[in-house]
């Protein structure tokens, strides 16, 4: 089996790096929205992980039942984080598979 040309490997590595940077830019420019309680609580999270917005339906705000609100907020945060992780895997997954062709 012949060894790959070093120039070809370098070119492939540079292409992969450019694709990786583009995927990272796309993720950073994205916003995902997590929700809980069928949309009673929604949380928007930027690709950087920063929470950018939160919406709480007033009908669930009950001073006598703060635990339910806390549970819904936590659920919305978890949902948003899961969606952000899925987005990153979708953008980065094909790139990591391509690295196997470079001998990594």
From Swiss-Prot:
Keyword 4Fe-4S: no
CC per GO annotation: bacterial nucleoid; cytosol
One Pfam family per UniProt: YbaB_DNA_bd
SUPFAM superfamilies: YbaB-like
Keywords per UniProt: Cytoplasm, DNA-binding
InterPro entries to which the protein is assigned, alphabetical: YbaB-like_sf, YbaB/EbfC
Molecular functions per Gene Ontology: DNA binding
Compartments where located: Cytoplasm, Nucleoid
Quaternary state and interactors: Homodimer.
Family note: Belongs to the YbaB/EbfC family.
Name this protein carries in UniProt: Nucleoid-associated protein jk2011
């Amino acid at each position: 089996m012949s060894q790959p040309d070093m120039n070809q490997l370098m070119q492939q590595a540079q292409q992969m790096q450019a694709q990786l940077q583009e995927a990272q830019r796309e993720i950073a420019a994205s916003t995902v929205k997590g929700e809980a309680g069928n949309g009673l609580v929604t949380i928007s999270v930027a690709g950087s992980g920063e929470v950018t917005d939160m919406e709480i339906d007033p009908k669930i705000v009950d001073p006598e039942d703060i635990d339910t609100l806390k549970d819904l907020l936590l659920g919305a945060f978890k949902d948003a984080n899961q969606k952000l992780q899925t987005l990153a895997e979708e953008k980065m997954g094909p790139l990591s598979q391509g690295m196997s062709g470079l001998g990594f």
